[in-house]
């Protein structure tokens, strides 16, 4: 039924010639049924870790003991890796996330019924075909996300499943079943028990989904609980390109909310600078105004802010892009490094080191307003007319005579 790669076929052959069972399980089976090539493969078996390890080593697979306590090993061959986990039952949960106790089982159904959604609770082997006790294939065909068994219990066991339901809805375009949706809202307060890093990871995947707008609109209350701020602008998601930084810029209002969700410092700084720059675009109507803005912001936050601004004000953004093209085509200066005059030249003329930055900044302001002034001789004369050289204590700009 499924087209399996060579190493995967070999794995199944090993187990079929042994007393043990082996099945593909979870997301890879779901992807196969949807016509999607899986990115990775999870397998499950009634063999204990020690038994699987012995089988695999005999057939020249490398074995990594990646999760012995959880009954998991990784089989490697020809740069391919496969996680194999013993059938298991989870008993009790710590802080609505991790099971208190794992009990290994001899029955596949025990392993499938502990899973989150019916679409992820399907197993497959080449000899036995699909094993689907919770009608997962039907939910895939109906494009529905439905919990295995009682939804509130599934969310109580692992509160991250609440966000996973929303994320799958956004990425796959599936609707959340009525009973599962009711449990999402009923159990939303359990999300406070989860680590910020887990919340951030699921939120990122959700925001990058093709149905992010529809899901965010329907479950805005849940997402506001996650990000701890009021969401004021969802409409941008309808047409926003699949760029995470841009979507974060539109989705969040305050940098502090990103920091609270443990986003990297680089992301938070980029967000802050882009927010500032975005506000300034409303007042940009000339090349000179635009160059002064380019002077203050690196190109990464500038371009990010402009891409977002284009979603809200496409006509004005197009005008700004036209001005930007003129600036770059003409090589007009807007940074200190673009100046014909360098700090070393100022030092050789007797200007003190601590004043050089201020002088170059004044020069830059002049050439931004008139690019023709960006000539070494002109700038030297301009500086001499405005600043005193040598080691004088008072190096304030010279006052111009009326």
Annotated model-derived regions:
Residues 1-402:
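Catalytic cores of the polymerase beta-like nucleotidyltransferase superfamily
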């Amino acid at each position: 039924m499924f087209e399996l790669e060579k190493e995967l076929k070999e794995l199944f052959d090993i187990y079929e010639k042994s007393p043990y069972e082996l099945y593909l399980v979870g997301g890879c089976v779901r992807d196969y049924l949807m016509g999607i090539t899986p990115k990775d493969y999870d397998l499950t078996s009634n063999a204990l870790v020690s038994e699987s390890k012995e089988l695999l080593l005999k057939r020249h697979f490398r074995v990594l003991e990646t999760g012995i306590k959880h009954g998991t090993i990784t089989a490697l061959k020809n740069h391919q890796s496969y996680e194999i986990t013993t059938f298991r039952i989870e008993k009790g949960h710590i802080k609505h996330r991790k099971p208190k106790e794992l009990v290994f089982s001899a029955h596949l159904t025990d392993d499938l019924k502990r899973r989150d959604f019916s679409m992820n609770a399907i197993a497959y082997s080449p000899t036995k075909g699909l094993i689907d006790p919770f009608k997962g294939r039907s939910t895939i065909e109906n494009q529905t996300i439905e919990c295995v068994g009682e939804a509130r219990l599934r969310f109580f066991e692992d509160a991250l499943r609440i966000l996973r339901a929303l994320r799958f809805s956004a990425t796959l375009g599936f609707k959340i079943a009525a009973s599962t949706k009711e449990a999402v809202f009923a159990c939303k307060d359990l999300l406070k028990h989860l680590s910020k890093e887990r919340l951030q990871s699921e939120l990122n995947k959700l925001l990058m989904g093709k149905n992010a707008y529809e899901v965010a609109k329907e479950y805005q209350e849940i997402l506001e609980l996650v990000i701890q701020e009021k969401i004021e602008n969802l409409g941008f998601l309808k047409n926003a390109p699949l760029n995470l930084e841009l979507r974060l810029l539109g989705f969040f209002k305050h940098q502090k909310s990103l920091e609270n969700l443990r986003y990297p410092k680089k992301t938070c700084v980029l967000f802050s600078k882009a927010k500032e720059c975005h506000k300034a675009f409303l007042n940009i109507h000339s090349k000179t105004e635009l160059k002064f803005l380019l002077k203050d912001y690196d190109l990464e936050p500038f371009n990010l802010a402009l891409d977002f601004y284009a979603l809200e004000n496409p006509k004005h953004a197009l005008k700004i892009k036209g001005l930007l093209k003129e600036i770059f085509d003409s090589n007009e200066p807007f940074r200190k490094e673009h100046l014909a005059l360098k700090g070393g030249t100022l030092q050789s003329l007797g200007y003190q080191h601590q004043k050089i930055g201020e002088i170059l900044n004044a020069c830059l302001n002049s050439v931004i307003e008139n690019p023709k002034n960006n000539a070494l001789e002109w700038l030297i004369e301009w500086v001499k007319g405005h600043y005193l050289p040598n080691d004088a204590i008072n190096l304030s700009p010279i006052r111009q005579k009326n």
